[in-house]
């Protein structure tokens, strides 16, 4: 489901009012091969959120969530925890035993937003070297737009 809330905008270069041909908001449900469901949302109109980029994965026994605004931490909930200890725990993911982190600073020091692009470039170059596809692929990205 998509929606364009603002149907016309002034072109920044020409000053002419033009029809808007892109979506201001999108949401879709998906059904994964393993039987689980997914909900994806994006919008330009989430006031109060500056570049909000989050994911949350919930399962029968555990859940994880991550937020770009706090990209060095992953939150984890384990339903098997003892009742009096149940709750979300925060995992600092910049120690050297986490993927990619052995290539950066001493364990525990934070990385920034730009470091994630270095990781993407490394994955891309590794895929060229090995011949194995990295993910997401251009086709996967295109398929989300159909």
Segments from the language model and where they lie:
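Short beta-strand micro-motifs enriched in acidic
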Residues: 31, 67-69
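A generic structural motif
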Residues: 31-33, 58, 75-77
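Rossmann-like dinucleotide-binding domain that binds NAD(P)(H)
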Residues: 1-51, 139
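Surface loops and adjacent helix of pleckstrin homology
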Residues: 43, 69, 76-79
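A short, polar/proline- and glycine-enriched secondary-structure boundary/capping micro-motif
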Residues: 9, 49-54, 75-79, 85-88
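C-terminal helical cap and adjacent loop that interface with cofactors, partners, or active-site loops
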Residues: 55-58, 82-146
């Amino acid at each position: 489901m998509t929606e364009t809330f603002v149907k016309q905008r002034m072109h920044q270069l020409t000053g002419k009012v033009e029809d808007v041909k892109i979506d201001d908001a999108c949401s879709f449900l998906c059904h994964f091969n393993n039987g689980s469901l997914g909900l994806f949302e994006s919008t330009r109109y989430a006031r109060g959120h500056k570049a909000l980029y989050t994911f949350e994965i919930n399962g029968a026994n555990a859940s994880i969530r991550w937020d770009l605004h706090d990209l060095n931490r992953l939150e984890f909930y384990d339903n098997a925890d003892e009742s009096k200890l149940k709750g979300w725990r925060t995992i600092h993911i910049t120690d050297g035993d986490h993927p990619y982190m052995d290539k950066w600073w001493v364990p525990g020091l934070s990385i920034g937003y730009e470091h994630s692009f270095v990781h993407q470039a490394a994955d891309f170059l590794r895929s060229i070297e090995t011949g194995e596809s990295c993910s997401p692929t251009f086709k996967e990205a295109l398929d989300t737009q159909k």
